[in-house]
């Protein structure tokens, strides 16, 4: 099975070390463009663009990278409860059309009550997933070309429709990650690829089995992906030394503050990440070559595969044997590490190198009439 390898655009900051300004660098458009172009040339399938108040806006960043890349896809967040499904569907179709079919979407429900409150969202965990399920149902139907009337608990639309369809049919693929039962049920029923953070293989296997069974109950098959950091070097010793350097500027106070911030979230996945290290520096290798040091201060994905190219490739193939076909990777700093992964790791894997998409001709059309419909040719009698 060929593997889809993704990289990451660090719109929330980048540098050589975690938890310090030492060794950091400006993350401006030029720098993000360098990373995107490197990923494009090295054969990555796409890039994940993060979302939230600590990041630049993912949609604007993705749109700005379209003209400077050729085959790279953009995995961009959909935010139920923050955006209406109709507006999100229009945005999704536009991004797909302007990028010639290079748009992918990642459903993000949110987990930090403080940040959500700042965005005007006051739903609890279960309510957010109810709203997300309704949002996704309407979003998908719109991209399928339906005119949608929907009267749910959280979402209400009447006569919603898209005038401009996406390039990818039936619609651009929808990704999603969540560890709670309600999250897995949503994934099983509505999404195309279920993402997990980088837990030890036995825990990932358990997750995959649960989601696969739930999807089968809905008569569906679902793909799987995993989100990991990577520290790959020419030797295992060099890789482990690089891992230690990454957290060499962390002090106990910074770790404690970060863990306190994570504790206020209601994300089951974040709780599982935190439990891998319990905020302590010792015993960070939680599974062969799987290191939890990143999660001491970074929210979300908090583990890294560490080793030389053949060693990291062996660990990746262990995950692939569980049914994972997509790997969303990152490393610090992201420009240099994109090259290291491409040069030291890719040769040891069966990497699916994306082709440059051929331009998709769009049907000629006149201006929309009354902002309501696209004019068509009148049949001659």
Curated annotation (Swiss-Prot):
Subunit structure of this chain's protein: Homotetramer.
Protein name per the record: Alkanesulfonate monooxygenase
Catalytic activity: an alkanesulfonate + FMNH2 + O2 = an aldehyde + FMN + sulfite + H2O + 2 H(+)
Biological function: Catalyzes the desulfonation of aliphatic sulfonates.
Chain segments annotated as coiled-coil in the UniProt record: none
Note from the entry: FMNH(2) which is absolutely required for this enzymatic reaction, is provided by SsuE.
Pfam families, per database record: Bac_luciferase (PF00296)
